[in-house]
Every structure is written in C-alpha cells, then in structure tokens.
Amino acid sequence: MNKDKLRYAILKEIFEGNTPLSENDIGVTEDQFDDAVNFLKREGYIIGVHYSDDRPHLYKLGPELTEKGENYLKENGTWSKAYKTIKEIKDWIK
C-alpha cells in the first residue's frame, strides 16, 4: 500500500465532499486508515477530525482541508488524472 497515495485519496475525497469516509470505503485496514488520518491532522493538512473510541472519524460535517492540504492536492496534480473517483481508490493506492 502506498501511503502517499492513500493520504492523497483521503484529501481528495474530503475536498470533493465525499464524507463520511472510512477504511471500508477505501479498502485499507483500520490501522492504515487511522495512521493516514492522524498524519494528515498532525501535519496540518486537515481540520475537523472527530475522535471516539480513540479513533479518528471523518463524518459528513467537520473535516476540511487547510491551505496546506489544498496545496498538497495542487502539487500532486498528476495523480488527479490517475485517480478519478472513490470507486477506483482500492486499486489505485496499492
């Protein structure tokens, strides 16, 4: 699993308003999803992450990209052509 692609996919889905979002939607393990979301929050790419049972949750309302997160999407724009929708995400992040 490519961590950078997973992080990009999570940012892209939040940006597109495709929340709520979970590991089941992306096809990764709970730990992989939690690690990616925690990284994105800790490094200042996203805000509005809710926590329950010591896990991050990306609900319909709340998660937003910061300016840093938006810049990450722009800087990795070449991935945008390869990644179009959440339907393709499971194969794309491998």
Swiss-Prot record:
Coiled-coil positions: none
Induction: Expression is sigma D-dependent.
UniProt xrefs under InterPro entries: Phage_Tuc2009_YjcQ (IPR018597), WH-like_DNA-bd_sf (IPR036388), WH_DNA-bd_sf (IPR036390)
Name of the featured protein: Uncharacterized protein YjcQ
Pfam short name (any one): YjcQ
